[in-house]
Structures are given as C-alpha cells and as structure tokens.
Amino acid sequence: ADTIVAVELDSYPNTDIGDPNYPHIGIDIKSIRSKSTARWNMQTGKVGTVHISYNSVAKRLSAVVSYSGSSSTTVSYDVDLNNVLPEWVRVGLSATTGLYKETNTILSWSFTSKLKTNSIADENSLHFSFHKFSQNPKDLILQGDAFTDSDGNLELTKVSNSGDPQGNSVGRALFYAPVHIWEKSAVVASFDATFTFLIKSPDREPADGITFFIANTDTSIPSGSGGRLLGLFPDAN
C-alpha cells in the first residue's frame, strides 16, 4: 500500500471511522483515522486558503485554513516525517464526492521544500507555483476524475457542463517532479504548501472533502478509496 501523510479538509463527518461529528480539518499519518483534528467552519461558495508547514527541527506538521474576513482554524501534530515517509516523495491534492457532493475546485497551489546539510553549498530546494492551471498541464499528473477547466481552475472531482458537482467521484493531481523530502545528513528539512479552494454544493450536507498529501513517488488512487477515504486509503484501518 502507499505511504501517505495528509492534511484533510473533511466536509462530511463519518463518525464510524473516528471523525468528529462536524466538518473538520485533520492530520492523517498512514491512516484515514486522523491523529489530530479541529472543528472547521466550512463556508460553501467562498474561496478559502490553506497553509501547511513542517520543519524537521520542531518536528511539527501544521495547517491553517482561513476565509477572508473570518477567523482561521489551525491543526497541528508532532511527527518526525523521516520515520514515516520515504526519502523521495510526490506531493498532491485529492478530493472525493459520494452520495452527497460538492465542487472541489483548486484555484491556486504553491509548494516549497528545502533540505540544508552541513556543507554550505548543499541546499536542495524545490519550488512550484500555479496561479492558474493550463488546459493540458505538462507539470501535473492527473489521476481519476481530476481535470483542468477553461477558466484555469483545477477540478479534482467531476462537474457537469453547467458546473454542478457530481456524486461518487474521486480525483487527484500530483506535481510531476519527485521531492527530496528528507536526507540523513540534513540539518534542516522543511516544506510549505499553500492552496486556495472553492467548495460549492447543492446539498444541505456537502461531501466529502479535499486533501493535500505526500506519498511514495509511484502512488496511485487505491481501489475503493472513494467517499470518506478521500482518494488516499484502501480501507478505514
């Protein structure tokens, strides 16, 4: 199975797999059962911003979700990613819909990772930034139902021609280049990711959510990972 670390924006509570009974953001380490969660006052139809950060000195993974003009939600978890992830990974965004549905639209996405070793010259870094997405993106690996639209947005799950979200959809987008996320001799390994998103839904209860995830380089959508499993995990263990 894939090795996954993720930050989830979970719009639909699945209490049977340990979700709190409200929309929440969470940190997932190798399982959909989040290690840490915080209540998320999701605002459908409004653009939100997610900022995720980690560094190997503090060994803390943190995420902040905010909408302009309202307070932000923060979640963090202490973890040494050297012990969890392979040295080389890919980073991506995933989303699903199920019986209930929502648009899982990504408007922008940026990422920076840095590895500093003791030698002065040796800093390994990777940076990318999408302010809009091209129609036939060469620098993204699109999986499942994910596609880029004519407005320059990345739609992670299916929408109709008129823009209505479709149910039972799963999609992911990964940056094409592998990321060197840690190294034994590194003094500091760190990364920052930011994305803006828009969730809209005709349903009273939108579902299921969006994630930022880090995985082994050959990661693919696991069979049966739709709905509550957010396109990341084959089961709810």
Swiss-Prot record:
It is found in: Vacuole, Aleurone grain. Its main location: other. Ca(2+) binds at residues 10, 12, 14, 19, 208. Hemagglutinating activity stable up to 60 degrees Celsius but diminishes with higher temperatures and is absent at 100 degrees Celsius. Mn(2+) binds at residues 8, 10, 19, 24. Keywords: Calcium, Hemagglutinin, Lectin, Manganese, Mannose-binding, Metal-binding, Vacuole. InterPro entries: ConA-like_dom_sf, Lectin_LegA_CS, Lectin_legB_Mn/Ca_BS, Legume_lectin_dom, Leguminous_Lectin. A carbohydrate binds at residues 12, 99-100, 228. One of its GO terms (cellular component) is vacuole. GO terms for molecular function: calcium ion binding; D-glucose binding; D-mannose binding; manganese ion binding. The beta and gamma chains are produced by partial proteolytic processing of the lectin alpha chain by an asparaginyl endopeptidase. D-mannose/D-glucose-binding lectin with hemagglutinating activity towards rabbit and human erythrocytes. In rats, elicits an acute inflammatory response by inducing neutrophil migration and induces dose-dependent paw edema. Belongs to the leguminous lectin family. Binds one manganese (or another transition metal) ion and one calcium ion. The metal ions are essential for the saccharide-binding and cell-agglutinating activities. Homotetramer. This is Lectin alpha chain. It comes from Macropsychanthus wilsonii.
